[in-house]
Amino acid sequence: MIPNEEIVLQPGQTNSFSISLVNQGSLQAINVIGEIITSSNLLTINNSNDSWGTINAGSQENSGNGFNVTASSDVVSGSQLIASLLIEDSNGYNRTENIVFRFGTVQVYDPLGPDNYGYYIYDSNDINYNLHPEYDWIEISQIGTNLNLANSGNGNWNGNGPLAIVDLPFNFKFYGIDYNQITICTNGWIAFDDVYSEAFRNYPIPGAGGPSPMIAAFWDDLETGNNGDVFYYSDNNYAIIQWDNMRTHFSNSSETFQIILNNDSNLPYGDNSIKIQYEDFNNTSVGDFNDYPPEHGSYSTIGIENHFANDGLQYSKL
């Protein structure tokens, strides 16, 4: 016997429903009962049991509309949850099947994701979700360390160059792996552990172009110019990387932004959370350099990518 439908719920909705079972066997199923089980906190099961009575061989029957569940208000529209349906009858038949709960329909003000690992990206417009971020700029140019990085764009640099490797004051779990060191690049990204490529041409993520694993806050060909600097600050609560008054190589637009790595573990599988903030955001590089193929990439790339470069979320790359 197998269920042949999915249950659709809106975030925060409580609903009673029946489940249709098809008896694909050759024997009559007598006194069929079922129980829904899940360990997810996204779904509260108010009444987990229902019955189908007798289902003849080759027939289909609905349960008595006794199942009752409540979807969490934090569940992301468009996502789904697979729960277990335990089925038994008085003849000794027992089987566990999957039952699919689908939550809402994706709208503009819903987070991006999930990727295959389970990450979502929430932005400040996702106000219907408790996890939506609020802008709270933490200025570190006066309290942090100036990494004294230098980059004149288009792969040219001098002095200390475009990369710095720094130790984190805590282990940061990213895609299930603990890291205690990051590589910071002037071109608007960080990678975990040692990376020796400045990757000034931005590409879609996930993908083979660029470092991995990475967090791209504003991956583009960026220059330090006369006033651009990259700062680093950390304490027991977070590590902050701030790109301050950087300039795009293509259009000389000003960019100031920061990545905050939080010392927490409130994401799926105990991973740490990430916050990206923009004080000055001008996504103006169109990627059309008349004299120098190939293109540098249209606009900036924003998102995350795992260590195999085969999973991630791309928030922006027009």
Q: Where do the model's predicted regions map?
A:
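Short acidic, flexible loop segments centered on an aromatic residue
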Residues: 22-43, 48
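Low-complexity, acidic Ser/Thr/Pro/Gly-rich terminal tails and inter-domain linkers that flank the onset
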Residues: 1-12
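Intrinsic-disorder/low-complexity, polar/charged segments enriched in Ser/Thr/Lys/Arg/Asp/Glu/Gln
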Residues: 14-16, 60-66, 96-98, 238-240, ...
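Short beta-strand elements of extracellular/lumenal beta-sandwich folds
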Residues: 11-27
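Terminal connector regions
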Residues: 32, 64-106
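Intrinsically disordered, low-complexity Pro/Gly/Ser/Thr-rich segments with frequent PxxP/GP/PP motifs
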Residues: 44-75
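Extracytoplasmic Ser/Thr/Pro-rich, glycosylation-prone low-complexity segments
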Residues: 71-73, 102-318
